[in-house]
Swiss-Prot record:
Gene3D superfamilies: Jelly Rolls (2.60.120.10). InterPro entries: ARD, ARD_euk, RmlC-like_jellyroll, RmlC_Cupin_sf. Binds either 1 Fe or Ni cation per monomer. Iron-binding promotes an acireductone dioxygenase reaction producing 2-keto-4-methylthiobutyrate, while nickel-binding promotes an acireductone dioxygenase reaction producing 3-(methylsulfanyl)propanoate. This is Acireductone dioxygenase. One of its GO terms (cellular component) is nucleus. Its main location: cytoplasm. It catalyses: 1,2-dihydroxy-5-(methylsulfanyl)pent-1-en-3-one + O2 = 4-methylsulfanyl-2-oxobutanoate + formate + 2 H(+); 1,2-dihydroxy-5-(methylsulfanyl)pent-1-en-3-one + O2 = 3-(methylsulfanyl)propanoate + CO + formate + 2 H(+). Fe(2+) binds at residues 87, 89, 93, 136. SUPFAM superfamilies: RmlC-like cupins.
Length: 187
């Protein structure tokens, strides 16, 4: 995992857009992001570590998603664009990268890189939890392939609320997230 300030220059979203300004893990933690490195080993020890993590956090369900040009065919470009629309969820977004690589961009919040995009580069063995209410977006990198395990507390659901839509800033999950960040920054 590598996190840094996104350069916000026009161009292919799948390129690094690295400003050279690194963001350390404690800063991500202030924004509510949980990160763990759980290397994928041939013996399968990673699976028991994921099971343990899921049990600790109350994740009862999981599935796998693969994003490739071959797998999605003509829908690939449209799907990538939809993932890259700035949005939030009312539940945590949990991903364990099994193969390939990509980027999660998260929006800074009050007192922590406010309104700047922070790009988090992920590869196989990286586990990330984005808190409910955080604005974010996702894209594969220039390799155009990623396979991830998605974990869910209840029934699998993935409802994005676009920042462009009326009312998104007023969702309870957004208010709760901002309050959590305020407390974390001032604590």
């Amino acid at each position: 995992m590598k996190a840094y300030i996104y350069d916000d220059k026009p161009g292919d979203q799948r390129l690094p857009h690295d400003t050279g300004i690194d963001i350390p893990e404690p800063t991500l933690a202030k924004l509510g992001v949980v990160y763990q490195r759980i290397p994928i080993d041939s013996e399968g020890a990673w699976e028991s570590k994921i099971d343990e993590f899921a049990k600790e956090r109350g994740y009862k369900n999981r599935d796998r998603i693969t994003v490739t040009r071959e797998g999605l065919g003509e829908a690939y470009e449209e799907k990538i664009k939809s993932f890259f629309d700035e949005h939030l969820h009312e539940d945590e977004e949990i991903r364990y990268i099994l193969a390939g690589s990509g980027y999660f961009d998260i929006r800074g919040a009050e007192g922590v890189h406010e309104e700047q995009w922070i790009r988090i580069a992920l590869e196989a063995g990286d586990l990330i939890v984005l808190p409910a209410g955080i604005y974010h977006r996702f894209t594969v990198d220039s390799a155009n392939t990623i396979t991830a395990m998605r974990l869910f507390q209840d029934e699998p659901k993935w409802t994005p609320y676009s920042r462009k839509a009326d009312g998104t800033d007023k969702l309870g999950s957004r208010d709760k997230y901002l309050e959590t960040v305020r407390v974390g920054v001032t604590a």
